[in-house]
């Protein structure tokens, strides 16, 4: 159990290190107005905090920096509350005040405002793709043998596949096929499309179009393929602006994680409980994120969490501001999604 004096010194050390990025020594602490102790007392308390594992020495300075244990205690018990400025609130409101017709644009804008307000890398995981509905289908001929099948969902998600056109099928057959698809499948949830295409739509096509099988099977594959929600990033390059990541060899594994996206997707998909979660350093299960903190928040419609937004940055992160921004964006995004779903 830390004493009140130790708690104060720990908080001031972490606040100062987050702000400056420089190790904090007893001389620096003695100049802080909230620290009214002698230099000897400060040194003794810092030695105790180091022995307890909350702060640690660096090789390049006599000062101390927070350890992962120190950051965890700070986030759980010492985090000072922070309010957003009017300008911040207005920026967030302006994003969600716009009328947005495609869900993917809404998610991308959410990622952008998070990155802009925090100067870290932001991530937004879209709502479950299988909950989307078919909005429109097109088949665009490329030549006599091939065409591109384009599928658009109500969220703005677009999938396309190259399909082989049977020699017995002409442009009129393709047009008729597209009309049947759009008439029978518009508004159908993607999760139900495969069954509907294999039964009801196939029966109609069988009566009107010869050799429809190969085109239909390719379209079924196109609609059945995307099982992972889309991940939206903003501010990827912000990582390189952090002093901790100035060594490109150290940051390369992290950049690989960001570029591959799948690992980040799986990480965010596990965030199903409402609220904010903070993972610090080695608490992150992905190799390459040992020097990072990942702060995630869920967004929802009603009581149902739909997805997550997150901020990825160094362990020397402005936790209070990031958590405040995430909470506000998650709240406004949830409200915007509720309106969007009601309008569909």
UniProtKB/Swiss-Prot annotation:
Biological process GO terms, please? negative regulation of DNA-templated transcription
| Record-linked Gene3D superfamilies | 3.30.450.40, Heat-inducible transcription repressor hrca homolog, domain 3 (3.30.390.60), Winged helix-like DNA-binding domain superfamily/Winged helix DNA-binding domain (1.10.10.10)
Molecular function terms, GO-annotated? DNA binding
Provide an example Pfam family for this protein: HrcA
Q: Which UniProt keywords apply?
A: Repressor, Stress response, Transcription, Transcription regulation
Coiled-coil ranges (or none): none
Source organism, top-level taxon:
Bacteria
Against PANTHER family, the record matches this protein to: HEAT-INDUCIBLE TRANSCRIPTION REPRESSOR HRCA
The protein's role, per its UniProt record:
Negative regulator of class I heat shock genes (grpE-dnaK-dnaJ and groELS operons). Prevents heat-shock induction of these operons.
Q: Which NCBIfam families does this UniProt record tie to the protein?
A: hrcA
Similarity comment: family membership: Belongs to the HrcA family.
This chain's protein is named Heat-inducible transcription repressor HrcA
* Species the sequence originates in: Geobacillus kaustophilus (strain HTA426)
* Source lineage: Bacteria, Bacillati, Bacillota, Bacilli, Bacillales
